[in-house]
Structures are given as structure tokens and as C-alpha cells.
């Protein structure tokens, strides 16, 4: 597979581990933490999608995805623990203007207020809402019943000072086109974000040589986008199958970290 990854002294690492164990890896603090948190939609993940049925046709009956979550950890996400650890992963607030770090969180529309509230509790008092516009919708089965969803949402979260901002003199609007990746980018994760979109966001809030961390890396597209831009990237993904697929198909040359034994840890996902 051809790769656009530059031959620079930047780092690309994906850890098959929970990011709560970040201290064991001695990774540097991040200029940008960017993550797609679980949407907590559980067994309704494919509810309005043709994937609910075999070959997309209800005449064929329900598929194996019917009544299933996107993945095992897409329920009971502990958002308080998430912000507690992300606050530690980011650089401290600098004295200088124009150098502050930030977080970008992808979330559902229903999660926006919750994310804002918990972010404030952990020191991220300011935010900028983001909207991502698609030219398609996953809600195909509802298309003759109602207006269907074709947007994704996110938040730029920061502490006090405005974060580093690299706009090259151009106005940056708070909505972005969501363009799907080409066939050269393998589809590994059900909520995988387009590399082109991730590159836009990373370019706005970081410089070459900065560190980008994705605590819920999934397929690793954030890591690849950052690395191709000359940013060192570190990611954590607890699901082994996603890590294996990312190392093999999406992140050529990545440092693969497979802990032989992962110590007992407090999970971000509440049991019960």
C-alpha cells in the first residue's frame, strides 16, 4: 500500500491499552487531544440503517448487526473519568498568548450539553461548537418518513486562553464538509472519521513537530492524519481487533504496542 507518510523524525504509536495507563509509556504532553467518544446509543446503533437487514433489504430478515451496538464499549461511557485523564494528557496553560493547547471532542447532538458541563468541571471553561456536514445519511430507512440526519457534531474545548490557531489569514467557519475517504483508506471502525477532515482540524490547532493524542483511537485515522502532517501522534485503543487491523492496514510503519499483560485497571466503562 502506498503511503503519504513523510520520512521525518516524528513518532507514530498505537497502544493496545486503555489510555488510563498512559504513564507506563512515558509519552509527551499533547498540544491537541482529539477523540471520538462513544455515543452510548447501544443496541440502536444500526436502527435506521439498511445494515439492520441482510443485504440491506427487510425482506431478507434481520442481519447479525440488528439490535447490536457498534462495539462492546459503546455503552456506559464514564465521561468524568475521561476528562480527568485528558486534562493530564494536555500541556499546561502557557503564559504566552497563541500557544495554549485544546481538545476536540466528536459527540452526538444529544451529548453536547453533557460534554460542555463535564468539561467545565475539569477546567475547560470555554468551547467552540463544530458542525460537520455530509452529503449522505445513514438513516436510509427513514428517508420517506422524515427529514434525516446528515450532520455530525463536535466541540473545541479549552481552559482560559484561546488555543493556538493557524488559519493562514483565512476566516475559518465552524462548519466543515464531511468528505468520505477514498478506496485507498480501509474502513476498519464503524465510526471512523475521514482523514481529510482530521487533517483540517489538526492543521488549524497545531504546528509541525507538535504532539497529537487520541485516547479512543479506534481505527487510527487521527494518528495517520497527524503523522502525515509532520506531527507526532500517540493513540490508545483497548479493543485488540481494531489495533491489529490498524497496524496491518492503516498505519504502515507504526510502532505496534501489544502489552503482554495489562494490569488490572479502573475502566472508563461503568459495569452494570
Map each language-model feature to its residues.
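Core catalytic lobe of class I
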Residues: 1-243
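Class I S-adenosyl-L-methionine-dependent methyltransferase module
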Residues: 110, 251-272
Amino acid at each position: 500500500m502506498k503511503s503519504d507518510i513523510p520520512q521525518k523524525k516524528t513518532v507514530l504509536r498505537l497502544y493496545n491499552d486503555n489510555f488510563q495507563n498512559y504513564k507506563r509509556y512515558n509519552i509527551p504532553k499533547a498540544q491537541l487531544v482529539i477523540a471520538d467518544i462513544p455515543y452510548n446509543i447501544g443496541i440502536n446503533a444500526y436502527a435506521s440503517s439498511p445494515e439492520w437487514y441482510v443485504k440491506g433489504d427487510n425482506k431478507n430478515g434481520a442481519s447479525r448487526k440488528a439490535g447490536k451496538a457498534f462495539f462492546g464499549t459503546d455503552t456506559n461511557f464514564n465521561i468524568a473519568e475521561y476528562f480527568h485523564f485528558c486534562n493530564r494528557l494536555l500541556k499546561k496553560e502557557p503564559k504566552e498568548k497563541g500557544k495554549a493547547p485544546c481538545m476536540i471532542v466528536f459527540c452526538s447532538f444529544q451529548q453536547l450539553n453533557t460534554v460542555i458541563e463535564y468539561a467545565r468541571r475539569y477546567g475547560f471553561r470555554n468551547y467552540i461548537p463544530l458542525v460537520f456536514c455530509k452529503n449522505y445519511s445513514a438513516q436510509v430507512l427513514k428517508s420517506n418518513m422524515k427529514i434525516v440526519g446528515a450532520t455530525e457534531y463536535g466541540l473545541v474545548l479549552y481552559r482560559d486562553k484561546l488555543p493556538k490557531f493557524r488559519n493562514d489569514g483565512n476566516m475559518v467557519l465552524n462548519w466543515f464538509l464531511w468528505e468520505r475517504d477514498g478506496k485507498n483508506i480501509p474502513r476498519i471502525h464503524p465510526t471512523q472519521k475521514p482523514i481529510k477532515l482530521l487533517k483540517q482540524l489538526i492543521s488549524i490547532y497545531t504546528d509541525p513537530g507538535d504532539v497529537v493524542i487520541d485516547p479512543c483511537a479506534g481505527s487510527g485515522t487521527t494518528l495517520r492524519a497527524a503523522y502525515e502532517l509532520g506531527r507526532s501522534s500517540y493513540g490508545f485503543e483497548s479493543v485488540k481487533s481494531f489495533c491489529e487491523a490498524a497496524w496491518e492496514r492503516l498505519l504502515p510503519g507504526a510502532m505496534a504496542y501489544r502489552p503482554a499483560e495489562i494490569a488490572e485497571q479502573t475502566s472508563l466503562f461503568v459495569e452494570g
